[in-house]
Structures are given as C-alpha cells and as structure tokens.
Regions:
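Conserved "HGTGT" condensation-loop signature of ketosynthase/thiolase-family condensing enzymes
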Residues: 1-400, 406-436
Length: 436
C-alpha cells in the first residue's frame, strides 16, 4: 500500500494523527516554510509523491506478469490527457523495471468510492484475476494540472494548499485464486531471464507485451486508440501509457500459438493468466506482506428517488441498517473498533452517523472518542476523491498495529453513503513493519 498526503507516507501519517490526537484540527503544518515556494518545486513534490505512492504498492506485484490497474483522478478539462496516459510515467517514477501494467479502467470523477465498486465488480466478473492495483490521485496541484472545472488555484496567493496532495495505491489480491489456478501449475525455472531467453514462455510473454504496447502502424494499439478517439469526437493525441486490457486480450490468441505451456498438470491459459507463473513468481506473491482484508462495500441511500435528502430520522434508520449489513461482512463476532469518515463539504452529516452508531449498541465506536472516531477532513484536510482510499489505508494501518476491524464511511455526491470494513490479518510477521 502507498498512502501519501503531503510529504508523509503510510504510518508516518497515522503516527502524526495519533500524536495530534485532535478530531477537529489537522496534523499538517500551517507554516508556508514547509511547502513548495515555486511552481517547479510544487510539481517536483507532486511527482515524488505520486511515484512513492505507486512504488510502495506496485513493487509487491508479481514481476513479468501484466497486472491490471484502475486509476482515478478528479474531473479535467476536455483537452487534458486522461489518467491512463500517466501510467508509463508513474511506473518510471516508481522505478518498477520488471513490472508490467495493463490499463484496466480509468476515470475523472468527483466520486472516489466508485473505484471500490469497480474493483469488486471486476473480481466478480473475471474469476481468473489473481491481483489488481487501484490508484487515486487528488490535491490542489493535481486539480491545477487537470484544470478541473470550478477549481480556482490559490498557489500564487498562498503556498499552503487548499487541498493537500493525496495519493493512494492499493495492491489487492485473491490468494484463493492463486492456490487454485496458478500454484499447482507453476513451472520450475531460472530467475535469470531477459529478452533473449526465448526458450521460456515468461520471456515470450515479456517480449510480446512490449511489442504490442510499443508497436506502431495500422494494427497497433496506438492506431486503435486514435480510431477510438475519433469515433468519440475527441481530437486524437498520442497515447503515452499502457495498452488497455481489453485490446491486449484480443492479441493473445496469436501469442498462445507460440508458447510451449510445459509444466505440471493441465494448465489452460486465460486472458488474465496468459502463461504459467514460475515458482519464483509464486514466491513473489507469497512474500508480499498481507496488510489486512478489504470487505465488500455496503451502500446506504440517504436521498429519495428525486435526489432530495431524507429527513434526519430516516437517514439514521438507513445508516443503522447499513451499519449492521457492513458488520455482517466481518468474521462472526467481530465488530469494528474505530471508524473513519469525512465531513469535508458537509459538517452536518456527522449527526445521523452519531445517532445511528449510538443506536447500534455499546460495541459500536463513538465519534466523540478521539481513539475511535477519525474525521479525516479535519485531521488531514480535503483529500477530494482520494478520501475513500485514505480512510481505507488508515483503517488498514490502525487495524494491523492495534488490532480489531476498522470501519470507513464515505458520503458520496449522489446522496449515498458507502460503508467499507477492513480487518487485520490473522497472522503477522514478527518484528516487521509492512508500511515502511
């Protein structure tokens, strides 16, 4: 996991929040001396934070295997490049030399919770997915670059950002699928592979990937992408990222004609597992730290069919029912020890949450307890569309270090509240901090 806000990452953020111990003010400095004093340095900080966030998560993905990536950013002006166009640069900033990325989906949106919905729908729709990366970026510098409609940049008036840089990258895996679809068929071979060791299927996959990703001419992804832009009425521009998973998979039938598929058992290649993993790739997967478990999101409608907010008493009842549904996603008998939420843009919505939790029994966390209720809009600042993943990231850190499940609840632009639970791993490596 790579959680970055401002200059801090992962448990640096959590430790600062805990040290501040104030649910009404930010841990972040309010001194201009602690922030970039020029546009160049501002962009440098943005690039460093982006690369660090992605590196902390993606370097644990399995090398030489194309990992699908979801990347979300705030809204942009029509002439600004889409988020997927940044994947190549982010990979380079993160120094991920043997990591292959697939553009699974991207979005410019005001609703960061959709990335969690898309992730779960993706795993449901594709039973051969072993792992995927989800990424959100936001902040004053990002919105300035994106020329986000309605955003007014104030950097020239004050270098203390109205929105801190906030980047979150999560590597989400399904070990049950690796155990069932990959581990029994893994092939024993050397780790000393490069583009010339073409006797191995893993090398053939590497070479075919780059041939297709960097290809030019009528049958290339670049040509396909340009045609797609024209069809959508968009001024064609060069694509500098990674090819889409959808297009890549249309190329695989030709690739499968070239592989040997030698190894134990009857392995059948699939769109997301195009060749057998090697035993050392399986070890890479096994050695990645398990930070916790992400539970299925529960949506709670707080508005009627016409978008009009429900009355407070109705919101309380809806949240109480949704809370119980979310608790039911946890292992039997487990209840969350803390809750992360965000009152940015709507301080009043804390009232129905408070009442719903109070009516849910003594085991529910209290927003009034500084060690149980975490308003990240106050404790950090406006993290925009990154807020849902910031909450999840902090919940993972808190649960890992202090035990117990953590709840996150995000009030979305469509009048829905989405509750996501995270729970700690059952076994932790002693004397290892996986957030560093």
């Amino acid at each position: 996991m790579g959680l970055v806000t401002g200059r801090n990452a992962n448990d640096e953020i959590w430790n600062a929040i805990e040290a501040k111990a104030d649910n009404h003010s930010t841990y972040m400095s309010q001194s201009p001396a602690d922030y970039p004093d020029s546009e160049d340095s501002r962009m440098t900080y943005l690039g460093v934070g982006t690369g660090l966030s992605f590196q902390l998560a993606a370097h644990h993905s399995v090398g030489y295997w194309p990992v699908p990536v979801f990347i979300w950013e705030p809204p942009k002006a029509s002439h600004v490049s889409r988020p997927a166009n940044e994947l190549s640069g982010i990979r380079q900033e993160a120094s991920l030399g043997v990591t292959l990325l697939l553009w699974q989906e991207d979005a410019n949106t005001n609703d960061g919770s959709t990335i969690i919905e898309k992730l779960f729908a993706f795993f449901d729709a594709h039973p051969d997915i072993p792992e995927a990366i989800i990424v959100t970026f936001d902040g004053a510098a990002t919105r300035d670059l994106n020329q986000t409609p309605g955003y007014v940049d104030t950097f020239k008036q004050s270098n203390i950002p109205t929105m801190p840089d906030s980047m979150v990258a999560l590597l989400v895996s399904r070990s049950d699928r690796v155990d069932r679809l990959i581990r029994p068929y893994a092939v024993e071979q050397t780790e000393n592979v490069d583009k010339n060791t073409t006797e191995y299927d893993i090398t053939k996959l590497w070479n075919f990937f780059w041939e297709k990703n960097n290809g030019e001419g009528p049958g290339s992804f670049e040509a396909y992408y340009q045609e797609q832009q024209k069809a959508a009425g968009i001024q064609p521009r060069a694509f500098l990222g990674f090819m889409s998973a959808q297009w890549w998979q249309t190329q695989l039938p030709d690739f499968w004609k070239t592989i040997s598929n030698k190894g134990p058992g009857e392995f059948k290649p699939t769109p997301y597992i195009p060749v057998r993993w090697t035993t050392w790739q399986v070890r890479q997967f096994d050695n990645a730290p398990l930070l916790g478990y992400l539970h299925r999101p529960i949506d709670v409608k707080l508005a009627d069919a016409h978008g009009k907010p429900l009355k407070t008493a109705q919101q309380v009842q809806a949240l109480k029912a949704g809370w119980q549904q979310a608790v039911d996603t946890l292992p039997t008998g487990e209840t969350p020890k803390r809750i992360f939420y965000d009152t940015t843009g709507d301080r009043a919505w804390v009232a129905p949450i408070n009442q719903a939790l109070a009516q849910s029994g003594p085991s529910a966390p209290s927003l009034d307890d500084v060690k149980e209720g975490y308003d990240i809009g106050r404790r950090i600042g406006n993290t925009g569309i990154s807020s849902p993943l910031v909450q999840i990231g902090l919940g993972l850190i808190a649960s890992y270090h202090e035990g117990g499940a953590s709840a996150t609840i995000h009030h979305r632009p469509n009048g829905t509240a989405t509750i996501v639970m995270v729970s700690p791993p059952t076994h932790k490596q002693p004397d290892v901090n996986p957030f560093r």
